[in-house]
Design a protein with these regions (language model features):
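SAM-dependent transferase fold signal centered on methyltransferase-like domains
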Residues: 1-259
Length: 259
């Protein structure tokens, strides 16, 4: 059973996926019901975080075995009382995997609420804390140090600074507020920094904020795979025509030994 509501897309994306999963060839091969089941299964999986957090090791600075040991020690500091393994990828020698634990369905929900935007919500599900720019609204009397329940406004309908929100929201877990409501919404200038320190997330995934920054790069698995498929060699010239914050360019440089 899905823990979160089914993901919703922009019209163009929905139309494309419908054509892919409900085309005549697929329905002929699988049958109408099986094709629909696969489509709904995709939507359910996309509503939840991946089963593993993937990190790429900077093999120029240290061995994978050494970084694996350091990372395990860092994760144990975050997850006191839990033994979360750090695994080596069976095919990609520079990748470490950390299993994501969840969803944790029995977390208590507190009266004080904090609503965050959808993008911030996605980051929280992947192990991030809540930073001030992601906060959309809070309950009326939230103070620094309060226990709060954090929710994502998945439809983008909550008004900034609202004291209550009865729209569609998804529970992300519990945290401790680092600031009061007035500090968040009545500041004379833009605020940065930590807003809510998550202590009981629905999905338990390590935070990589300042965790071994010179040794690790938090990177989604598909972005890693493409560099290995390319198999760049030292001395070659590589033109990256899709250079975005996915880490592919630096990975290519690492595989080429910066040559």
């Amino acid at each position: 059973m899905s823990f979160f509501p089914k993901i919703s897309f922009q019209y163009e994306v929905e139309e494309y996926l419908t054509k892919v999963f409900r085309n005549k060839e697929l329905i002929t091969a699988l049958g109408t019901q099986e094709a629909e089941n696969k489509y709904q299964s995709l939507l359910s999986h996309l509503s939840h975080p991946p089963g593993f957090t993937t990190v790429r090791v900077n093999t120029h600075l240290a061995s994978v075995k050494h970084v694996k040991k350091l990372l395990f020690e860092e994760i144990q500091k975050q997850f006191k009382g839990l033994c979360v393994p750090v695994l080596e990828h069976p095919k990609l020698q520079d990748i470490l995997l950390i299993p994501v634990i969840g969803p944790r369905r029995d977390l208590k929900r507190h009266a004080s609420e904090v609503i965050v935007g959808a993008q911030c919500g996605y980051a929280v599900l992947r192990g991030a804390h809540v930073y001030v720019p992601g906060i959309v609204s809070t309950s009326r009397f939230v103070k620094a140090g309060d226990l709060v329940s954090v929710y994502s406004d998945i439809e983008g309908k909550c008004k900034r600074g609202a004291k209550e929100f009865d729209g569609v929201k998804v529970f992300l877990g519990n945290g401790i507020s680092e600031l009061s409501r007035s500090e968040i919404f009545c500041s004379t200038g833009p605020l940065r920094g930590l807003g809510i320190r998550m202590i009981e997330p629905v999905y338990l995934s390590p935070s990589f904020d300042n965790v071994l920054p010179s040794h690790l790069f938090l990177q989604n698995l598909p972005s890693v795979v493409v560099s290995h498929v390319l198999n760049p060699q030292p001395g070659e010239k590589i033109l990256d025509m899709c250079a975005a914050p996915g880490g592919k360019t630096t990975h290519v440089a690492t595989l080429m030994h910066d040559q």
